[in-house]
Amino acid sequence: MAKNIQAIRGMNDYLPGETAIWQRIEGTLKNVLGSYGYSEIRLPIVEQTPLFKRAIGEVTDVVEKEMYTFEDRNGDSLTLRPEGTAGCVRAGIEHGLLYNQEQRLWYIGPMFRHERPQKGRYRQFHQLGCEVFGLQGPDIDAELIMLTARWWRALGISEHVTLELNSIGSLEARANYRDALVAFLEQHKEKLDEDCKRRMYTNPLRVLDSKNPEVQALLNDAPALGDYLDEESREHFAGLCKLLESAGIAYTVNQRLVRGLDYYNRTVFEWVTNSLGSQGTVCAGGRYDGLVEQLGGRATPAVGFAMGLERLVLLVQAVNPEFKADPVVDIYLVASGADTQSAAMALAERLRDELPGVKLMTNHGGGNFKKQFTRADKWGARVAVVLGESEVANGTAVVKDLRSGEQTAVAQDSVAAHLRTLLG
């Protein structure tokens, strides 16, 4: 007997019982995006490898350790996308969407990183990202954060996420801080773990978000990033904080907050939670004013964020169990008798025409009334429409409210109107 082929480790199947809650959450997110005037862009999951090396940085963990890279039959190096911003910028440049224009874009789909799989962190994972181009003031940074705050309210998780903010300044200011930080770390090299020693010269800002408690204790005496900010970045950050305060959005300034990708400048932010154990970040982003030019376009200010959907689903399920998936079926059409199936299918098609948006499932595979009502209950139907031989003969149907148990005989021409009233 042939051995069963299973999914690749860290790349998961999501079965119908799971995808239903995903669909409701995604629908909520998309509705909010639409209310802010953001437009969807759809991007390839495979890009040329140099795109990510140039955008993310060759000495980042993502590029050095985590990318799925391969050669195609022409010998070109291709990579499964580890994040969405680089591809979105590439598309904007390629299709002339960015220069001297304002764009508010969002995308959703799978990303790929070769990490150690654990709860909330997978090798294939799903992100929803937003990117705004052509606007450089702190007001658009604030709007993106306000948008995410509206998501949390809509999902019922506002009390379980907190906002952390920082400014990492201009590229020049960050270079000055980098030198000061490296000098400090060199003086205390014996207290660093091997990972931090490696990062000290390649990407020293990542030492700031080390998870090692001893390193974090050492960093209490390190130079503060805020002391090295240029004046424009200070003003930009102060403006952002003022806007968030006016909007009633609470935040904490975390001067050790940096992002793991090299393209960020000025604003960086994270929404974090204590409800998912070690995987605390739900949504993160910031400003990347130099990336468009870095990838071959003309200088264009930009800001954006990405959110891991697996973690968001876990969080919603953990803290808001009342946020349930929509039922698979609203109406279940029960048919019993030798000649009723054809009539039932015809009635079902008519009801789908007259009740757009209502989910109606017709029973197939026979079965007595008891079995069919059991199926209706399994699919979460609120109402059953019953056709037996006598109903077909006299042009009626029985409409049964599966919650109250009340049932009514209705002329088939009036079934849609009756259902509309019953379903509200």
From Swiss-Prot:
Its EC number is 6.1.1.21. PROSITE patterns: AA_TRNA_LIGASE_II (PS50862). Belongs to the class-II aminoacyl-tRNA synthetase family. Keywords: Aminoacyl-tRNA synthetase, ATP-binding, Cytoplasm, Ligase, Nucleotide-binding, Protein biosynthesis. One of its GO terms (cellular component) is cytoplasm. This is Histidine--tRNA ligase. Homodimer. It comes from Escherichia coli (strain 55989 / EAEC). GO terms for biological process: histidyl-tRNA aminoacylation. It is found in: Cytoplasm. NCBIfam families: hisS. InterPro entries: aa-tRNA-synth_II, aa-tRNA-synth_II/BPL/LPL, Anticodon-bd, Anticodon-bd_dom_sf, His-tRNA-ligase, HisRS-like_core, HisRS/HisZ, HisRS_anticodon. It holds the Pfam family tRNA-synt_His. Its main location: cytoplasm. It catalyses: tRNA(His) + L-histidine + ATP = L-histidyl-tRNA(His) + AMP + diphosphate + H(+). It is an enzyme of class 6 (ligase). GO terms for molecular function: ATP binding; histidine-tRNA ligase activity.
